[in-house]
Amino acid sequence: HVAQIELGLLLAQQKQGEEAVQLAMQALAGAPKDSQVMVGAINVAHLSGQSDQAVAWAEDGVRRFPEVAGIRLFLARLLVALDRPKDAQAHYEVVHSRVPGHEETLRGLLSCAVRTGDNDKAAHWADELLALKPNDALVQYWHALTHGQMPTTQPPEVVTSIFDDYATNFDLHLVRGLKYQTPKLIADALLARFPDRKFNLLDLGCGTGLVGVYLGRIDGHIIGVDLSEKMIEQAARHGIYSRFHRVNVLDALRETPADHYEAISCADVLVYVGDLAPVIPNALRVLKPGGHFIFSCETAGEDEADLVLRPSQRYAHKASSVERQLREAGFDDVVIEHLPVLRMENNQPLPGFLAVARKPLTA
């Protein structure tokens, strides 16, 4: 039966989900009292993209093997992924009552409390986690947030965890589901400024390479930077990028020599970076004279703070503040294009803006 599960896992990874789940069913029928087979079957269904089946087996597993914490944790993770945090929380609480101080359980409880908007509970779990992991940047971030402080940037782990999970379906999810046009708008803005296609581009937070896809071939190099290895793997398949660096946006800018690129693009990335103070001056330094920095932001209202952390855990920026920062850093010819629909969020249009800033030809 274990062999059936192993084969099922292999088939699931090869995108043969139906056959994989059938094998898992056979294994479960043949070994109904084996908790390891149950865990394997749940994993097969999960890897096959059959979430409902995975949850059904996990719920059955919790009934059959109530003492096996691993099955209950697996169920809780599945429920969180299906946006059922209240249901997940109940299972995390059971595990916590039996095994206090378990890191994954505490992280799960914190996540559920944040998702359900229960800030008192979130602060409590963040306190427990910080006592357990005092040097963990992600824990420090959530602890600050749940205690009423707004961190001015997010630790890289926040972004990596989001986008590694997203990678294979990212283009489809964004372009079709969220009416996401930013990479095309950035590509159009670049081609309007470089009609001969002669430029080198640093694409910060390149994701699956949509800016490159919309640009097509250029007479120069496109260098992609992203924290998510899985995103980079997807982007590489287009055959448009010259090379990639797996590093965060701030480090990429800091480590790039001065006067190096004709253009820098940044599509839907600064919403995760937050504070632009370390971004804008370095972008100016890295650009060649006459080069362009093109990026998108979610809009914070003019009656709001310059930087606002939304419940989505993305930062919104005030357009007038961004324009001021660009000009103060030394950019000229700054254009802000307001976009009524940057993307869709919970079936509602989310406003944003595209900023295009040129480095002066002479210092």
Task: Name each model feature, range by range.
Residues 202, 208-253:
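Class I SAM-dependent methyltransferase SAM/SAH-binding core
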Residues 314-330:
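Short alpha-helix
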Residues 295-314:
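Short, glycine-/aromatic-enriched active-site segment of Class I SAM-dependent methyltransferases
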Residues 108-160:
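N-terminal auxiliary segments of SAM/dcSAM-dependent transferases
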Residues 277-289:
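A short glycine-rich, Lys/Arg-flanked "PGG" loop and its adjoining helix->strand segment in the class I
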Residues 6, 40, 74, 108-109, ...:
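Canonical tetratricopeptide repeat
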Residues 254-264:
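A short acidic, Gly/Pro-enriched loop at the edge of an enzyme's catalytic core
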